[in-house]
């Protein structure tokens, strides 16, 4: 039996793919905050805030998204991990903590680099909270569906990145 997904427990998903390129080559792509907009059917792009012009711990950006059922929205995020050629992570601002945490991890191998993109929901408030509050009996299904959407977009991202090599 599958564990029931609860937003308060910060559910997550991730996808990985081995790409035949070095971490250095891939890092040049992954450190561009707009790269996923080329492949995602939801994320449309981002702009740096507060004078930032490149990723670094503490740098902030505003991302724009579009979803056929949710509509259009923007959110502000902060880079929380920046380890060149290894790991980049950002948290989406939410009430009471991050609404979500996103990132990429790279691990060099003899076949290239394993690139993992991941997303953790919560624990701060996000658009999912209203849906869950309206249908608390469907919390597991709402979260499972959203994680499936995120995983599908992450698969598209990694496939797109691989196509650039």
Question: Can you name each region flagged by the protein language model?
Answer:
Residues 19, 65, 119-121:
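Hydrophobic beta-strand positions in extracellular immunoglobulin-like domains
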Residues 1-52:
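Hydrophobic ligand-binding cavity/cleft-lining segments
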Residues 47-101, 111, 152-156, 160-164:
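Glycine-rich portal/gate segments that line the openings of hydrophobic small-molecule binding cavities
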Residues 1-20, 141, 148-155, 159, ...:
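Hydrophobic-ligand-binding modules of eukaryotic lipid transfer/binding families
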Residues 18, 80-81, 107:
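Well-ordered beta-strand positions
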């Amino acid at each position: 039996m599958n564990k029931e997904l609860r937003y308060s427990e910060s559910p997550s998903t991730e996808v990985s793919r081995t790409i035949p390129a070095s971490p250095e080559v891939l890092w040049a792509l992954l450190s561009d905050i707009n790269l996923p907009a080329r492949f995602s059917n939801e994320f449309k792009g981002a702009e740096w805030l507060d004078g930032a012009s490149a990723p670094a711990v503490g740098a902030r950006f505003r991302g724009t998204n579009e979803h056929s059922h949710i509509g259009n929205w923007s959110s502000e995020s902060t880079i929380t991990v920046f380890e060149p050629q290894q790991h980049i992570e950002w948290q989406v601002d939410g009430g009471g903590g991050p609404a979500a945490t996103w990132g990429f991890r790279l691990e060099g191998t003899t076949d290239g680099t394993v690139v993992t993109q991941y997303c953790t929901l919560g624990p701060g408030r996000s658009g999912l909270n209203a849906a869950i509050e309206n249908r608390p009996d469907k919390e597991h299904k709402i979260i499972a569906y959203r994680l499936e959407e995120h995983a599908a977009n992450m698969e598209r991202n990694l496939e797109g990145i691989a196509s650039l090599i």
